[in-house]
């Protein structure tokens, strides 16, 4: 038995059951970030008594589960992924809605952003508030999830995934929060926004607490950077990670014709979940001490 937050609602996309995942959404106050956000939590259906699950935290949470919640009507399709691939590892997925406009760049960057292409969108210095954002997840969101849902709370069973700037903050968490998370995924990471800082920090990090890391980038990315820039900088990040991690724990995929959009990330999502959590297997009856 678990207790969802009192203002939680079950979206239409999952009311009929048979999803493989049942999910709810609620609004939470984030005092450190001085904003409110919707929080989405998906948990496997047909749970056994005493069963507990690994947890995956995802950025841009409104785009994770279904099209009805997504910003432009297209999601990562996590609900559909579990319908199409019922053998995917059974995990709890937590999605936190992002901030609006330039504040998203602030929260999703661990380092100050220095890229001329951003001037078109945000006419002021941004970035560098990633620690504040990650502290919110670690100190507020994760304890709430662990208290109310059947999680396995230890780092070796906890992951984080994001796309674009969400990939940037996920990578930063791999450098700075391995006492909490150990499995990471970055899709179409926009690392060029603070490339030198990202690569320098990666080269200095030990990464001994990183159990798995999945990177992917498309050949037809768009946005602030150009197509070649996305591929080049993701290759550079992969090269830096590969110096620190054994090859079986690191995966890098260049997706032919992959674009910078949720529809493209939805196609990669099953591979991400499978790679990050397949060594754990099904939910555990007797989890490690919490």
Q: Where in the sequence are the language-model features?
A:
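Non-catalytic cap/lid and distal C-terminal segments of serine-dependent acyl enzymes
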Residues: 5-290
């Amino acid at each position: 038995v678990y207790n969802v937050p009192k203002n939680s609602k079950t979206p239409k996309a999952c009311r009929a059951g048979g999803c493989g995942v049942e999910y709810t959404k609620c609004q939470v106050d984030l005092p450190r970030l001085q904003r409110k956000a919707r929080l989405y939590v998906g948990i496997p259906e047909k749970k056994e008594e005493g069963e507990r699950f690994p947890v995956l935290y995802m950025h841009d949470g409104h785009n994770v589960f279904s099209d009805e919640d997504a910003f432009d009507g297209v999601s990562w399709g996590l609900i559909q992924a579990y319908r199409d691939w019922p053998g995917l590892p059974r995990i709890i997925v937590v999605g936190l809605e992002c901030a609006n406009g330039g504040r998203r760049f602030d929260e999703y960057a661990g380092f100050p952003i220095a890229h001329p292409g951003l001037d078109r969108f945000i006419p002021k210095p941004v970035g560098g508030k990633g620690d504040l954002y990650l502290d919110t997840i670690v100190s507020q969101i994760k304890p709430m999830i662990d208290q109310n849902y059947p999680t396995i709370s230890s780092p070796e069973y906890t992951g984080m995934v994001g796309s674009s700037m969400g990939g940037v903050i996920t990578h930063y968490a791999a450098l700075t929060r391995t006492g909490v998370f150990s499995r990471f995924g970055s899709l179409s990471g926009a690392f060029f926004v603070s490339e030198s800082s990202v690569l320098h920090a990666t080269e200095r990090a030990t990464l001994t607490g990183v159990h798995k890391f999945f990177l992917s980038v498309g050949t037809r990315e768009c946005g602030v950077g150009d197509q070649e820039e996305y591929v080049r900088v993701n290759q550079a990040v992969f090269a830096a990670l590969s110096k620190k991690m054994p090859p079986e724990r690191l995966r890098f995929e260049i997706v032919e014709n992959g674009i910078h959009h949720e529809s493209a990330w939805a196609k990669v999502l099953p591979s991400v979940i499978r790679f990050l959590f397949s060594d754990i297997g099904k939910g555990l009856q007797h989890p490690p001490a919490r």
